[in-house]
């Protein structure tokens, strides 16, 4: 097991956690057995493989590898911190051990997806008491994983999926029509991965078409790295550019233009959390998910806007599911709050009664 000493140190400080045989952290059953948990923000190889060039489209079935060790987050075990966004502290100097590790992980961390097969997802859901999950597709222009994901969700009642149409697709209308004949529960838009600004003309035109379907739209939102990291050479120039595509101020025109559309702004705004709280107060048609956010921020969300528009999500496989579950347990004060966040809000959206 990699990082065995450091992982056991984490266990000594968090009685709710244990280690699976592959070295990933999981929740102890005693702490989760009374809850129905729906992970509203997951990814899988099958839903994202089109983002990779053909030479890297390789599904890995080794369930003995810890996904936490392969992913971007935490940036290193030395930086692990359950009370921070991404459950990781952030280095501010490239020429340091953690700075170099972070730069490498920002480049290689996406390859954890090769191991995040449907079989692995279901296994990890079982380990963490998660009953159902929403898998979000992300597609480059003129490609999609609609048929593959349709076959998967049709064969497994524990899984749902959100469709993905790129704003630069040549025939957006036909893709939307095809998806609407599938069992999708909503739409996924990812500006920083797909290379467009959420408020650009093409994006707004796409959102208008998606809004007509009546399905909710989940968008990655907020600054994905803190300013103190962006001011260094740790991220590449392209990464620095891409993370700006979903700044929360860019969402103002989106939300003002489509006040009747149900949006889920993912990650609670990442490192723009305070701005997300204000945005949620202003726009009652907006939900958020708590993927990557620590307990302190989740507690603030509940105190400021209530628990009825907060969704449980993890951003699996990039973030260990147990950390987000533990964060909700620590942030909530009663069973009603936990029920809303873990499952009730998700059921409302998945059943179309929002």
Please tell me what each predicted stretch does.
Residues 41-47, 220, 267:
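Histidine-centered divalent metal-coordination motifs
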């Amino acid at each position: 097991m990699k990082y065995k000493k450091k992982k056991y140190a984490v266990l000594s400080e968090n009685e709710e956690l244990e280690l699976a045989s592959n070295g990933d952290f999981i929740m102890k059953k005693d702490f989760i057995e009374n809850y129905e948990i729906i992970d509203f923000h997951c990814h899988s190889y099958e839903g994202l493989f089109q983002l990779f060039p053909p030479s890297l489209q390789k599904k890995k079935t080794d369930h003995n590898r810890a996904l936490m060790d392969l992913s971007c987050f935490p940036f290193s075990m030395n930086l692990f911190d359950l009370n921070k966004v991404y459950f990781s502290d952030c280095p501010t100097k490239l020429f340091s051990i953690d700075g170099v590790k972070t730069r490498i992980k920002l480049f290689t961390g996406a390859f954890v997806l090769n191991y995040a097969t449907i079989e692995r997802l279901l296994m990890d859901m079982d380990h963490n008491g998660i009953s159902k999950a929403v898998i979000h597709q992300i597609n480059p222009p003129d490609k999609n994983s609609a048929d593959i994901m349709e076959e998967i969700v049709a064969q497994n009642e524990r899984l749902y999926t959100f469709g993905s149409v790129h704003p630069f697709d040549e025939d957006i209308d036909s893709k939307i029509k095809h998806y609407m004949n599938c069992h999708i529960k909503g739409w996924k838009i990812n500006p920083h991965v797909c290379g467009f600004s959420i408020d650009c003309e093409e994006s707004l035109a796409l959102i208008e078409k998606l809004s007509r379907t009546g399905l909710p739209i989940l968008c990655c939102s907020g600054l994905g790295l803190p300013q103190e990291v962006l001011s260094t050479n740790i991220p590449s120039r392209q990464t620095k550019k891409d993370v700006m595509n979903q700044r929360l101020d860019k969402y103002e025109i989106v939300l003002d233009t489509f006040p009747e559309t149900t949006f889920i702004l993912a990650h609670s705004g990442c490192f723009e959390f305070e701005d997300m709280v204000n945005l949620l107060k202003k726009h009652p048609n907006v939900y958020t998910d708590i993927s990557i956010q620590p307990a302190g921020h989740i507690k603030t969300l509940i105190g400021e806007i209530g628990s009825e528009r907060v969704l449980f999500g993890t951003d699996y496989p990039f973030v260990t599911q147990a950390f987000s579950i533990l964060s909700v347990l620590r942030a909530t004060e009663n069973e009603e709050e936990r029920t809303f966040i873990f499952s009730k809000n998700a059921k409302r959206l998945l059943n179309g009664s929002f």
